[in-house]
Amino acid sequence: FFSKSKFISILFFVSFILSKQSYSNEFDKISACAGVVMGDGAAELRDLQNESNFDNAFELAIKAFYGEGLSNPRSKEDITIAESILASNVDKIYMQPEWTAEVYEEVIRCYRILGLKVLEKSDLIKNNIDMINQYLNKYKARLKRIINAG
């Protein structure tokens, strides 16, 4: 026999577990798209020496990443996985030997997703803009240096 309070406790526990998983899934999705957009910007800098497009892509990706990342409590493991997903997708796009229609569609889809995420999290981003800009400038400079050295 399940008492009413046990049932409610189990329901609450299951809801908590599922909601935490959905937070992680959304963060993973945004991390993946941030990597795709950063990879696109990096390829623009490498192939076309278009620093403005690189800067814009990087800024959009970082703001969406931190906007989503700061919106819920995250474990160190969640953050580590999200950063790995981001880095993997930067490499995936940056190292593309040729752009197929599928790659192009993925890049466009990710720009849209990140644009919407920045709009959705705009207040959170504004409230944390100093911290976000520190990371933005630090990592943008590092990636530019790596691209220009290669």
Language model features with spans:
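Compact alpha-helical subdomains of small soluble proteins
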Residues: 61-150
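Compositionally biased amphipathic helical and low-complexity segments enriched in hydrophobic
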Residues: 8, 12, 19, 46-49, ...
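Intrinsic disorder/low-complexity segments enriched in polar/small residues
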Residues: 5-7, 21-22, 52, 77, ...
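Structural motif
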Residues: 22-30, 98-102
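Short N-proximal segments of mature Sec-exported proteins
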Residues: 25-80
